[in-house]
Amino acid sequence: MTYRNANRMMASAVLLTSLSAMSHAQKPPVPEQDWATRPVLRVWPGPAPGSETDTRKESTMHPPDSATMHIVRNVTVPTLTVFQPKDGSRSKTAVLICPGGGFRLLAIDQEGYEVADWFEQHGMTAFVLKYRVAETPPKDEDFSPPNMPMQEQIKRILAPLPPDAVPHAIADGIQALKVVRENAAKYGYSPDRILALGFSAGGGVVTGTMLAPNPADRPNYAAPIYGALLGPTPEIPKDAPPAFLAFAEDDPLVQPMVLRLFNALRDAGNKPELHVYRTGQHGFSMTERGTSDHWLQELWWWMELFGLTNP
């Protein structure tokens, strides 16, 4: 698969994660007034490198056919939203969560805030990363006109990504890990117990961080869920972090890239864990779709293996 075709394939995941996902049974989203008042940390001390002259305005909107879910577009200022247990962290592990959205938007609820809320309720501090995404029309009605035929939506989504979209997102992920580690004492977790968890395109961000050439740029543990790097998998570092991978067998988008990553990790002696669910399609995250409903509990069991759920 060429890098360009991989880009187009991953970009089409936007429709599945952010548009068609609304037709599946979902758990209630985290109330807007809850996450809107949580602490927010800047990822970069100044303008994000490469975006110094970008004047786009970030936009949050409801996807078609959903009055409760949110997607975020035109992110140019990466941030971390903090979810911390009200009675303090019961575990010294922190989780960095990277939502998906084809590098064009962020499915911020079902692949971000809802996941962070789950970890918070289980005694862990979690951070939801808004990383930079490719430009989309500034007006919501131009991005997703109410009566636009699905074929036209697909045509828009499958347009080639800008060449800097993926590198910018990965750079934001690496810098976000630094910010999470810098805030370990403040929020009560260990800087060497950081799990990076990402979905779809966010799984690509996580994979980019776990394979970073500089060990200091990597998370301690990584969980790319139905996502991996676009194009060829780079050389696997000998000391790459332990990895938990998962996707659904009926997901037509990411099987080759996830299996390629799994095999590369295994060949490098990483001993990755892979879960392939019979049902779930692409973008199952916190929705109810079948056997994939249990991925989060299985991730928790994997974390127990490494002592990450302990105080």
Role assignments for model-derived ranges:
Residues 27-89:
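N-terminal cap/lid segment of alpha/beta-hydrolase-fold proteins
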Residues 91-100:
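Short beta-strand element of the alpha/beta-hydrolase
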Residues 143-185, 297-298:
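Alpha/beta-hydrolase active-site loop
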Residues 165-239:
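Primarily recognizes the serine-hydrolase "nucleophile elbow" in alpha/beta-hydrolase
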